[in-house]
Curated annotation (Swiss-Prot):
One Pfam family, short name: DUF188
Family: Belongs to the UPF0178 family.
Name of this protein: UPF0178 protein Patl_1318
Length: 147
């Protein structure tokens, strides 16, 4: 298992949890972004800067990940693509996307997008707090223990 991080919008708290987990478990981890992302000095942790552009980091992750890798992303279409390749997808709030759930999650996302396009104020997710941080850490640990 390798961890791929869609790092452009990944919260700092999540990156810190990931750095500690990668160092503790010696799992290889790559952060992918269209800007420089600093990483701690560790042979298993790397950062790759892709060209700026729509979905460039997502496309790189989809191209590189393989079955049983873990992708950290809040991007639902990216999660759907990596799940189709047999990888795991976990969002920074601790929600594990699965083959069974990703279709309905995509449908809800598309519906909300349509609502916003028609001028309806839909709001966004709540503030990122301890509950979300703990859910992420717990699911990450569970996935790493299964490898």
């Amino acid at each position: 298992m390798k961890i791929w991080v869609d790092a452009d919008a990944c919260p700092v708290l999540v990156k810190q949890i990931l750095f500690k987990a990668a160092q503790r478990t010696q799992v290889e981890m790559t952060l992918v972004a269209n800007q420089h992302i600093p990483v701690p000095p560790d042979k298993n942790i790397t950062s790759i800067q892709v060209q700026s552009g729509f979905d460039m980091a997502d496309d790189y992750i989809v191209e590189q990940c393989v079955a049983n890798d873990l992708v950290i992303t809040a991007d639902i279409p990216l999660a759907a693509e990596v799940i189709a390749k047999g990888a795991h997808a976990l969002n920074p709030r601790g929600e594990l996307y699965t083959k069974e759930s990703i279709g309905s999650i995509l449908n809800i996302r598309d519906f909300m997008d349509t609502m916003r396009s028609s001028g309806v104020q839909t709001g966004g997710p709540g503030a990122y707090g301890n509950k979300e941080k703990q859910a992420f850490a717990n699911n990450l640990d569970r996935l790493l223990a299964q490898r």
